Amino acid sequence: MAGRNLVGPEADALNLGTVFRALGDEHRRSVMTELAADRSDSERGCNSFDLPISKQTQTHHFRVLREAGLIDEIDYGNRKGIRLRRADIEKRFPGLLALLGAGPPADTAPR
C-alpha cells in the first residue's frame, strides 16, 4: 500500500532557529543521529527507535522534526515511516549532520 507523505517545509524555507529548537531535545537529537548515521537514508519505522518515552510522546517528537523540515513522515494508515531529508539539510545547512556525530562530510574526510 502506498503511503501518504506528510510534508514539512521546502528546502529553501528551512529555518535555522526552528531546526535548532527541534534539535534541542535529547530524544529528537538521538533520532537524528541514528538517521544521519545510515548513509543509505532508508526508511525506518517509528517504533524502530529505542526511545524511553511513550508512543504519544514519540509521535510529538516526530511531528516536531517533520515541521522543522528534518524528516519526512510517510503515513501508511496503521504505521508511519520516517526518512531523513539529508539532501535538503545539506543543501541548506552544510555540515549540520556532521555536527550530530554522523562523521565528516565525504569531501572533508581526513586523508
Give the residues covered by each predicted segment.
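Canonical helix-turn-helix DNA-binding module
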Residues: 47-70
